[in-house]
Amino acid sequence: MVTESQVVVPQNWEGSVPEYIAYQTFIQLGREPGKDFTYQSPLMGGRMEKGGFVLDFLFDNPPDLAVNVQGVYYHYEFGVEAKARDVMARASLAGQNITLIFIDDDDLMKDPRFYCREALNYKDHSRLGGG
């Protein structure tokens, strides 16, 4: 298992350590940023608009796939409002034929290749996905 303190993240990285691990793992799995996926993709106005949100990863390869890294504390222990936002984001994307897969940060720290590969195969092992 990797701990956040063991990961060297570039100073200009704007996301979380688990998001960086996922980013690097998707690259190791043969996906190219800017071509196969976009990192931090705002939809429906992003966080600045009511009902908008930001996807951690929006993929073109494979098509119609989005992946969000879920911080266990914020997304599960912070209350029902955070969970409701995640469920609404998933439903909104489903209406656009995009599958939103969640990867829990604690799972990502244990085995990034497994969980990222599973996400690329549209398999959700997160607490929200029933995993």
Question: What are these model-predicted stretches?
Answer:
Residues 1-131:
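Nucleic-acid endo/exonuclease domains
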